[in-house]
């Protein structure tokens, strides 16, 4: 299989037929073997019923139905886990991103890149969405240095090796380019056409921005020590232990010089607390190291209710 397209679906019943018609037309023009994996993320409308009809009409379609709404990251992860293509494409189901841009992104990938991120330009959303997205992207660029204008664009093309090295949860789907870039993959972007939403309602809200920023802080904090937790915890613990020891040394010196009783002084209690906390952090680092060594892969964080696939796609 050359190409796997993963499409997360949540209450998009009105756009699915047109989406697949336009997507399949553009994929056929490429001349490679492809599959489309629709992941119904607990839709409340008739999305799954429409997907079943599409599945029956084309053998290149696979449908996964999650038991409830797990969120976009887990929907994508379910699709990635079932994708067989050497190249992975992600595309939202709302038709705001144009399927006609897929061949152009693949051309960019052939220039030697590992991931090509879409850049919705000009963006056809309301000003609040555009404003929050602009702020979000500026913050990501300022702290990470990744020169992308639209990191959260749902239209992405990347090599399979990327999904084999990153783990998605929470709101981390928006950081796929950053996670790949931090691991040494070549990442670029290309402007893509963007259309106003014609069907359904937008899933964007300000709480997603906040959750996304919190996930970014988590990534930035732990990424440097993911494979060696002792670097983060042990160094911090050692610093705290030395600080506590320094306070004890200072108080002991005052006792020797001025005969001051220190055992019940608040500063002495604080020093002992710091030393104990430092030791605990050091051992936490060692424990984290052990967990990394014995854990080969994370447990699946989503639950599949139904899977539809044709025998030749197994």
Task: Describe each PLM feature range.
Residues 12-27:
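Short, well-formed alpha-helical segments that are part of the catalytic scaffolds
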Residues 175-314:
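Hydrophobic helical membrane-anchoring modules
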Residues 14-18, 45-54:
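Acidic helix N-cap motif at the loop->helix transition within catalytic regions
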Residues 20, 32-42, 64-65:
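Short beta-strand/loop segment that forms part of the nucleotide-sugar
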Residues 2-4, 35:
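Cell-envelope/extracellular polymer assembly enzymes that use nucleotide-activated donors
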Residues 53, 60-82, 87, 96-179, ...:
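Acceptor/aglycone-binding surface of glycosyltransferases and processive sugar-polymer synthases
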Residues 40-49, 95-96:
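A conserved acidic beta->alpha catalytic loop
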């Amino acid at each position: 299989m050359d190409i796997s397209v993963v499409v997360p679906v949540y209450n998009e019943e009105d756009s699915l037929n047109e989406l697949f018609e336009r997507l399949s037309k553009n994929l056929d023009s490429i001349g490679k073997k492809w599959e489309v994996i629709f992941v119904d993320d607990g839709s409340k409308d008739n999305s799954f019923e429409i997907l079943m009809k599409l599945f029956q009409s084309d053998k290149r379609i696979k449908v996964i139905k999650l038991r409830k709404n797990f969120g976009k990251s887990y929907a994508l992860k379910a699709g990635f886990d079932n994708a067989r293509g050497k190249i992975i494409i992600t595309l939202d189901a709302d038709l705001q991103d144009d399927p006609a841009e897929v061949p152009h992104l693949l051309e960019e990938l052939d220039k030697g890149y590992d991931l090509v991120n879409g850049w919705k330009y000009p963006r056809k959303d309301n000003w609040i969405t555009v404003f929050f997205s602009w702020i979000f992207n500026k913050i990501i660029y300022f702290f990470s240095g990744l020169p992308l204008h639209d990191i959260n664009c749902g239209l992405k093309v990347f090599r399979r090796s990327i999904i084999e090295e990153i783990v998605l949860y929470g709101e981390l789907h928006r950081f796929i380019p950053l996670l790949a870039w931090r691991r040494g993959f070549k990442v670029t972007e290309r402007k893509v056409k963007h259309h106003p939403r014609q069907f359904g309602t937008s899933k964007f809200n300000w709480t997603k921005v906040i959750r996304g920023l919190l996930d970014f802080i988590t990534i930035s904090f732990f990424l440097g020590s993911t494979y060696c937790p002792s670097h983060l915890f042990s160094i911090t613990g050692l610093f705290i232990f030395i600080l506590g020891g320094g306070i004890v040394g200072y108080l002991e010196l005052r006792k020797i010089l001025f005969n001051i009783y220190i055992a019940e002084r608040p500063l002495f209690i604080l020093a002992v607390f710091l030393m104990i906390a430092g030791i605990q952090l050091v051992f936490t680092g060692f424990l984290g190291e052990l967990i990394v060594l014995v854990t080969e892969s994370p447990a699946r964080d989503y639950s599949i209710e139904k899977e539809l696939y044709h025998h030749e796609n197994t």
